[in-house]
Amino acid sequence: MTPSSPPPPAFYYLTNFERALAWLGERYDDVFDDRERAFLQAFPSLPQASRALLVRMLMRNGPDFRASKLAYDEIGCPLAAAAPLVAAGWVDPAPVLTLDEIFALCTKAELLRMFAALGAHAGERKSEWLDRLRLEHDMAQPFDVWFSGAGQPGAGQPEAGHPGAGRDDHVLRVTVGALCDRLRLMFFGNLHQDWSEFVLADLGVFQYESVPFAPSSRAFQRRGDVDAYLALHACRDALDAWPDDAPLEALVDAIGTVACGQPWLETRRAKLLFAVGQAGERRGAWPLALDAYARSAWPGSRHRRIRVLERSGRDDDALALALDARAAFESDEERQRVERMLPRLQRRAGRAVERAAAAPDVPRDTLVLARPDTFVSVEYAVRDHLAQPGAPVHYVENTLINSLFGLLCWEPVFAAVPGAFFHPFQRGPADLHAPDFAARRADAFAACFAQLDSGAYRETIRRHYATKLGLQSPFVFWGVLSPELLDEALACLPPAHLRLWFARLLADIRSNRSGLPDLVRFWPAERRYELIEVKGPGDRLQDNQTRWLGYCIGHGMPVRVVDVEWAGDVVVPAAAAGHCA
């Protein structure tokens, strides 16, 4: 929300939640079980304060909440609001709490009074108390019993008048958390977003493309798809909590047994197996890492297998796999990594070392500039220095090529492919970085690329610029793409070059949407351009920048690197500086 935006309505979060429930109810009734269906039917009939309280608790870390911490002006008394939730069976008004749970709910001062008779003292941290008390205190009891000291001879009593202390406070436990997490997953398509991130579209802060949701485009086609996602998510959580000294083979097997009936779920499995492989590498568990990577189709898995084979001393196997990769690289990133490894692998395997193909010679000039009196980025300094009447220079970095691609290919990017769109407030498809993103939309992308041959691309880009202006997009940078920049780009960038850029971008969106040169200079009268990568003193080209520069040079595109030095810092031959006019 911008500073000038009005504050949201008092119950904005409840409106969001109810919209999500209505959205799900219209599209997934056949996927719900009886309990979920009953929840969706009963929720609207509860008093507004009760509905709001439940959503507030779902938006916070739970499932246990002290009533004194649920103070919301629009809700009023939390206990009164909770009564209908208790009657519905969605909230437990007197949960039995373990030692760990009571520690999570209470302050250090409260715990000190509660466990004074057991030797707790102020000099210890809460975590130290908890570790020690676990060894001698395994009971579970309601909150008021913990606070009264029952069962703890000599335990301290709460101070009189202490707000929310002891029996004056209550704990409420949400018992429909798992059910609502399942609904949250079905709406957002993931479990890292929560209801607090759900922004009302009609606040005008963000606007989204309208994506048609046909039954065939649903991400979850059957209940088992939701179960599969949750099973993979549980495996991911297990990996994060897995003890360092425990073998990971059982987790790999568990991931393999999940029944993934959708391609996008298989992609999630592949990504998870890749993460397990990385964990195996960190532990030096080479066989486990190899197995996980071999089962994974996630980009980079083959390169990691080569690394593991090398690190485990299997030099011949590492070389053989690297040569297989060289025969058909999966991406430019893999090509760059494997070509760096091959000479070393050949030496280690006792083979003749093949000379790597020479990298394209990228034109490189040095420009000496007076150091600005106030801070100006080196890219802007070069832009201002090079700009001339009839030859404007723009700082665009990754924004221009991405934006032109996004405008030309708007329809395939926002195609309602299963697993791509879950709700009406998405910036882009959820599978944007999946290895099969382009393949699942191949015909639509081919139709867009064909416009580069027919000349229709200019009209399509201009039409989308006019009709989609301001809509969220993973590619289009509306704040950078001015009408003037768009006109100059369409006049000066050849469609053959656009096709090459777009094809490379689409081949590996995760890696190739960044690394493009900083500046573009146009000569509109001559309908030509050049791309310029700017490097300040001490800056080096990054791998993705090197790949883009090599690609452009290899296809005959006008591109160069300009190294900037500040006058007075170093002495640069005049001839070297003279190329930047």
Give the location of each predicted region.
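Alpha-helical protein-protein interaction scaffolds
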Residues: 261-352
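Conserved catalytic cores of phosphodiester-cleaving nucleases, focusing on short active-site segments
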Residues: 481-501, 518-521, 525-538, 552
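Alpha-helical solenoid scaffolds in eukaryotic macromolecular assemblies
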Residues: 40, 85-87, 297, 312, ...
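Basic, amphipathic alpha-helical patches used to engage nucleic acids or provide basic targeting signals
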Residues: 85, 528-564
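Basic, glycine-rich
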Residues: 1, 564-581
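Short acidic, S/G/P-rich loop/turn micro-motifs used as interaction or catalytic elements
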Residues: 61, 328, 537-540
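A short catalytic or substrate-binding loop motif that flags glycine-/basic-rich loops and adjacent residues
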Residues: 510-515
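N-terminal alpha-helical interaction modules that lie
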Residues: 2-52, 56-276, 280, 348-493, ...
